[in-house]
């Protein structure tokens, strides 16, 4: 598993909260987001046998940063520290005198994103062909951390998720759907297809996968349903 990989010792657990705002994890308020993520991080650290943990926010997510900054944690007001230059989480563990810190950084895009994320947050370089676990780091997303919190503290199974829709001007930016719901049902519930739709994409435009049918279901890993305009679709001419 991610938390206890065979033959590897996890010393640090990271919750990657740079990919979406607090509402994307089914939280009622930013304050609830902060308190529940801290509790989830404790659970993850215990499961992994890790001594250190950090929640990584996106530097331009002002609402989430404000929510965490107002929390009283371990007897003092929590501070969200920026990852700048050589100041990685190791610096803030010592500076704040805590084994759990909350930091912020810009969102990272591209291939091997988790390896770059690990280096940017911890300063540990992940060798080519290896994973963060090889340098003692386990990474968990907000949705998985929220699901763990709900299961342990509320006895609630993971059967629904929040996804966003891109390319539908008349649709809410975030919708709560049951896992297994076909894409077409989500689209119809949000007012139907746009007048012109060139491509249906699961997840974002940058890293998503084009779908040949709207019968595909929403899964635990679905974060977005995107629509690309016909003029934006690249079509190579046949030779």
Question: Which ranges hold each PLM region?
Answer:
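Hydrophobic alpha-helical positions that pack around
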Residues: 3-8, 51-183, 189-194
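Flexible loop/turn segments at secondary-structure boundaries
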Residues: 21-23, 62-64, 171-172, 184-185, ...
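Short, well-ordered secondary-structure micro-motifs
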Residues: 25-26, 66-67, 113, 211-214, ...
């Amino acid at each position: 598993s991610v938390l206890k990989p065979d033959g590897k010792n996890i010393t640090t657990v990271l919750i990657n909260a740079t990919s979406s705002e607090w509402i994307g994890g089914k939280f009622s308020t930013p304050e609830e987001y902060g308190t529940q993520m801290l509790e989830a991080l404790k659970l993850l650290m215990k499961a992994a046998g890790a001594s250190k943990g950090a929640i990584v926010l996106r530097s331009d997510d002002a609402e989430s940063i404000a929510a965490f900054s107002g929390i009283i944690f371990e007897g003092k007001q929590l501070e969200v520290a920026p990852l700048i230059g050589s100041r990685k989480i190791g610096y803030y563990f010592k500076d704040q005198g805590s084994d759990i810190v909350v930091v912020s950084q810009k969102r990272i895009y591209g291939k091997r994103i988790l390896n770059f994320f690990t280096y940017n947050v911890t300063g540990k370089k992940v060798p080519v062909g290896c994973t963060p676990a090889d340098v003692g780091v386990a990474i968990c997303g907000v949705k998985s951390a929220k699901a763990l919190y709900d299961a342990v503290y509320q006895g609630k199974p993971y059967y629904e998720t929040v996804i966003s829709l891109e390319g539908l001007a008349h649709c809410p930016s975030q919708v709560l759907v049951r896992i297994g719901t076909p894409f077409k049902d989500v689209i119809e519930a949000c007012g139907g297809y746009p007048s012109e739709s060139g491509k249906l994409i699961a997840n974002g435009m940058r890293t998503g996968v084009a779908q040949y049918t709207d019968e595909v279901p929403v899964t635990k890993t679905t974060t977005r349903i995107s629509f690309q305009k016909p003029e934006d679709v690249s079509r190579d001419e046949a030779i």
